[in-house]
Amino acid sequence: MLFFNSILNDAPSSWALYFQDGASPSYLGVTHLNDYLMFYLTFIFIGVIYAICKAVIEYNYNSHPIAAKYTTHGSIVEFIWTLIPALILILVALPSFKLLYLLDEVQKPSMTVKAIGRQWFWTYELNDFVTNENEPVSFDSYMVPEEDLEEGSLRQLEVDNRLVLPIDTRIRLILTSGDVIHSWAVPSLGIKCDCIPGRLNQVSLSIDREGLFYGQCSELCGVLHSSMPIVVQGVSLEDFLAWLEENS
């Protein structure tokens, strides 16, 4: 599994066997929780399959006709199969709740980005920065049609205006919608948050390395739902300031 994912993969790829390569603390928390749960699920799967096979093979009517006819319950067995799942649920719930609350916490952000979902494109507003006309920096991001793609670009994932953000910076991402419900999701950043009309949701974002990170709207929002890709470009602070200067 690790062999097939040794190269950085910030976008979906064919025959992938694991998550995309992450670039944020949120992503690391999600993958660690997944690996933690898979450890317990493996033993649960083996135990359940073993119990079913043993019951079918050894405890059928032909092998034990009297027990099959007169045994109706076993108090010890019922106690065990109630206690063990309860303990497993506790072991699963504790780290899950911890991660859930950590993902909801936004700690002293250095900048705020507002993403507005629309049919069928995204609008981004960087209200901490203004243009030469003293207006907040904002732009729309549309999917690039297949016939206009440059060589090496990803089909149905490339956009005309990428969301450029500095790395190693605490960012507050505010999400809403201008029409129907959308969902802003970038797997390699560990973020998926609904964009609901009339409501502001917020998540914390911090990018660990430079690169391009691809995502899509993950809430069915109409006939062109598949035409709402997201591209986040992580750059150094110097390059981000240069991009701001160019787009002001």
UniProtKB/Swiss-Prot annotation:
Domain of life: Eukaryota
Mitochondrial intermembrane compartment segments: 1-36, 101-248
Binding residues annotated for Cu cation A2, in chain numbering: 217, 219, 221, 225
UniProt topology in membrane: Multi-pass membrane protein
Residues binding Mg(2+), per UniProt: 219
Function: Component of the cytochrome c oxidase, the last enzyme in the mitochondrial electron transport chain which drives oxidative phosphorylation. The respiratory chain contains 3 multisubunit complexes succinate dehydrogenase (complex II, CII), ubiquinol-cytochrome c oxidoreductase (cytochrome b-c1 complex, complex III, CIII) and cytochrome c oxidase (complex IV, CIV), that cooperate to transfer electrons derived from NADH and succinate to molecular oxygen, creating an electrochemical gradient over the inner membrane that drives transmembrane transport and the ATP synthase.
Record protein name field: Cytochrome c oxidase subunit 2
Species this chain originates from: Schizosaccharomyces pombe (strain 972 / ATCC 24843) (Fission yeast)
